[in-house]
Amino acid sequence: MVLQNDIDLLNPPAELEKRKHKLKRLVQSPNSFFMDVKCQGCFNITTVFSHSQTVVVCGNCQTILCQPTGGKAKLTEGCSFRRKGD
């Protein structure tokens, strides 16, 4: 008997795996990452941790790039970011 809602447990869809808890995925992986943040004033690029717990300021112009929340850091409006590669 085959049910309509059967899911292949060895090859789950990527969107289902991304929503699962980091320890309950088929292959464990963290939710955090490093990113390059570009300052809106001087266009200087700074590497920032996605879940940083301190305020991050630009090295050149002392502009605040991101502020901690409770989980992911909140980027300042106007700042652009790019996720760092592996």
UniProtKB/Swiss-Prot annotation:
Cofactor mode of binding and number, as noted: Binds 1 zinc ion per subunit.
GO BP annotations listed: translation
Domain of life, per lineage: Eukaryota
Assigned keywords, A-Z: Metal-binding, Ribonucleoprotein, Ribosomal protein, Zinc, Zinc-finger
Cofactor: Zn(2+)
GO MF annotation terms: mRNA binding; structural constituent of ribosome; zinc ion binding
Record flagged with keyword DNA-binding: no
Gene Ontology cellular component terms for the protein in this record: cytosolic ribosome; cytosolic small ribosomal subunit; plant-type cell wall; plasmodesma; ribosome
Gene induction: Down-regulated by UV-C treatment.
Zinc finger (C4-type): 39-61
Coiled-coil zones: none
HAMAP family per UniProt: Ribosomal_eS27
Recorded family membership: Belongs to the eukaryotic ribosomal protein eS27 family.
Record's protein name: Small ribosomal subunit protein eS27y
Organism per entry: Arabidopsis thaliana
Lineage of origin: Eukaryota, Viridiplantae, Streptophyta, Embryophyta, Tracheophyta
Gene: RPS27B
